[in-house]
A protein has these predicted regions:
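Conserved, short, structured surface segments that act as functional micro-motifs
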Residues: 106-152
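Short, surface-exposed secondary-structure edge patches
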Residues: 60-63, 101-102, 106-108
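Zn2+-dependent peptidoglycan hydrolase active-site motif and core
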Residues: 66-103, 129
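Solvent-exposed coil/turn segments that connect beta secondary-structure elements
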Residues: 45-47, 58-60, 68, 76-77, ...
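Conserved beta-strand positions that form and line the central face of beta-propeller blades
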Residues: 54, 85, 95, 118, ...
């Protein structure tokens, strides 16, 4: 496995910037764009071992790269279905789980906003069409909410 799971997250209080963009403290170090359209159906909860955010959406919707990087894994896993893992600058890694289809392959360099997959409902742990989105830094899980740029 690429990562160790640790029951700790980074919880930063939200701040608000101009132009109705929600800004959190983590954004200053590594700002991420929302990886798909939809609504958060389940938040980050390290105590319950839910190490990401679930964004419910329509099957087949575009899943976007949250930041520039390199695809280090694009394939199938039993629990997560079609999974893509992207390595970014400064030790950050993002994971995109339960996709219907993957549009990029391992080794591909990608840019923030590139369509990398289609939202789906694959894998044993999926409970409906959604994207499970995770953020890691140097092998430690972080709460993506603290890094996501979201319009209000």
């Amino acid at each position: 496995m690429l990562f160790r799971s640790e029951e700790q997250g980074v919880y930063n209080s939200g701040l608000y910037a101009q132009n109705n963009i929600s800004v959190n403290a983590g954004m200053y170090s590594f700002p991420l764009m929302m990886p798909t359209d939809g609504f958060v159906s389940r938040g980050f909860d390290a105590e319950r071992k839910h190490f990401g955010v679930d964004i419910a959406g329509k099957t087949g919707s575009a899943v976007l790269a949250a930041a520039d990087g390199n695809v280090v894994f694009a394939g199938w896993t039993y629990d997560d279905g079609y999974l893509m893992i992207i390595s970014h600058q400064q030790g950050y890694v993002t994971a995109y789980k339960h996709n219907q289809a993957l549009l990029k392959t391992t080794g591909t360099n990608i840019k923030r906003g590139d369509v990398i997959a289609l939202l789906g409902n694959t894998g044993k742990t999926s409970s409906g069409p959604h994207l499970h989105f995770e953020l890691w830094k140097d092998g430690v899980v972080l709460n993506p909410d603290s890094y996501l740029l979201t319009t209000q």
